[in-house]
């Protein structure tokens, strides 16, 4: 039988950004020489923070700043950015931010989407490397994280997504509103609903909310 140690050697536990950083450490050089450096050594910032960094303010044009902000707004409004928008955004980060050792949180995922789209051999590797994908708190997935997941899912991938729409607390940063229903339809998954809530069984007010 598999021991916990043996199983641990075969399991990767991470989040969306952690997965992307691991991929960029291996393949980031495909889109930028600057990414030959460990991505964890860059200063990670939000898109709206870029213009507040004095060193970046000197190199970012008004148009650059607008592109960064529009991408952030698109993601927060759960609108999947086009391939052209991703390319324009990524080029600004590559040309203007990376040389000064800055990277945006969104770029960490958008760089990986670009790599998986442009280098099918990398995509095939990750699809075969992860035959089973389990995502907890799936209801908090935003549009670019969803695009990332779809990129590494193949016809043979086994999927288990755990989540509760009632606990969707990241709508303000772009968590997709109907992601639980979407994934059931898109991948013909079986929805399993828990009929009993043991966490709040002694709290009548929470049980009332759960039933509604």
Indicate residue ranges for each PLM-predicted region.
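Short conserved AdoMet
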Residues: 6, 127, 153-154
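Loop/turn-to-beta-strand initiation segments
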Residues: 131-132, 156-160
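Conserved P-loop NTPase-based nucleic-acid remodeling module centered on helicase motor cores
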Residues: 1-69
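A mobile, often basic/glycine-rich helix-loop segment
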Residues: 17, 156, 175-176
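Accessory N-terminal region flanking or inserted into the helicase ATPase core
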Residues: 50-134, 143-148, 171, 178
């Amino acid at each position: 039988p598999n021991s916990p140690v043996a199983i641990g050697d075969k399991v990767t536990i991470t989040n969306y950004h952690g997965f992307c950083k691991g991929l960029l450490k291996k393949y980031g050089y495909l889109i930028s020489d600057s990414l030959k450096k460990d991505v964890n050594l860059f200063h990670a910032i939000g898109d709206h923070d870029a213009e507040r960094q004095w060193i970046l303010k000197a190199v970012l044009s008004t148009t650059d700043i607008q592109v960064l902000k529009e991408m952030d707004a698109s993601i927060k409004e759960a609108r999947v950015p086009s391939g052209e928008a991703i390319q324009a955004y990524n080029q600004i980060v590559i040309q203007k931010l990376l040389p000064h050792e800055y990277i945006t949180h969104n770029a960490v995922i958008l760089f990986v989407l670009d790599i998986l789209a442009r280098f099918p051999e990398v995509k095939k590797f990750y699809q075969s490397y992860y035959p089973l994908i389990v995502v907890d708190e799936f209801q908090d997935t935003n549009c670019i994280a969803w695009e990332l997941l779809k990129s590494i899912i193949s016809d043979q991938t086994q999927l288990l997504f755990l989540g509760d729409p009632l606990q969707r607390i990241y709508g303000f940063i772009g968590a997709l509103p109907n992601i639980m229903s979407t994934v059931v339809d898109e991948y013909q998954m079986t929805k399993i609903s828990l009929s009993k809530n043991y966490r709040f069984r002694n709290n009548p007010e929470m049980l009332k909310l759960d039933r509604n």
